[in-house]
Amino acid sequence: MRILIITGLSGSGKSTAVRALEDEGFFCQDNLPVMLFPTFVELVDKAKERVRDVALVMDIRGRDFHAGYEKVFQEISEAGHFVEILFFDATDEVLIRRFSETRRRHPAMESGSVPEGIRYEREQLAGLRRLATMIIDTSELNVHQLRELVISHVKGNHGGREMTIHLQSFGYRYGIPLESDLVMDVRFLPNPYFVPELKEFSGLNPNVRDYVLKYEETRIFLNKFKEMLEFLLPGYRREGKSYLTVSIGCTGGRHRSVVITEEMRDFFRTKQLNLNVSHRDMKKGLEK
């Protein structure tokens, strides 16, 4: 069976992810003690109605959640099941705003404030975060975008047989995506922002694309970036990595990073990989 461990910060979107997984046919179980995970998986595996996909929610609400979970995951894997850990995260600012909007109490709050609860929860979940197969930063995602991302992941990655690539552009002005495995800074490339007739367009505009790609330094960079990935991808496959997030950033995330991300889209398409492409910050500036 395929076992997804759903974990992460309170308010980061785990409930949305679970609902999306249920719609995709996953058998989902919330608030189960960690030490019972192997027994639960064994019972489901022996059920008359064959279940292939299971999602188990694991978070700070389970007071024993940090008790021997590495051994538990290993036990499930050794029983022949494929285990993935999806860790949902968001910035403190976004989490605080979400709790304020919903008027929910943070589960880690005793007598302290929401920020203190978030800080405590981050400390408690740090070990799980390091083990995560995939870290999903939901700070800039709405419910529909998060749902789409989760569904795209589970449909594209069946039992780890193929690697899924998430290729995204971003703006350093808004922060590096937390879930990044590889980050490429393209702020050294010629900037269409300073060309009056191009400034208000995005990197999807043909004229902006032509401007960025006409420079020799851009072409040299693309060749070297592709050469590096040609070297890295087989190594990641040998390691058994099932999901790779490649983030490409420029200052505002609207021009250069979008152009380069679209160019790399064509490169990854030739590699017979599952590919998701997004432009996180492209719409945060003026666009035509």
From Swiss-Prot:
GTP binds at D59, I60, R61, G62. Pfam families: PapZ_C, RapZ-like_N. ATP binds at G8, L9, S10, G11, S12, G13, K14, S15. Coiled coil: none annotated. Keywords: ATP-binding, GTP-binding, Nucleotide-binding. It comes from the Bacteria. One of its GO terms (molecular function) is GTP binding. Displays ATPase and GTPase activities. Belongs to the RapZ-like family. This is Nucleotide-binding protein Gura_2968. It comes from Geotalea uraniireducens (strain Rf4) (Geobacter uraniireducens). The lineage of its organism: Bacteria, Pseudomonadati, Thermodesulfobacteriota, Desulfuromonadia, Geobacterales.
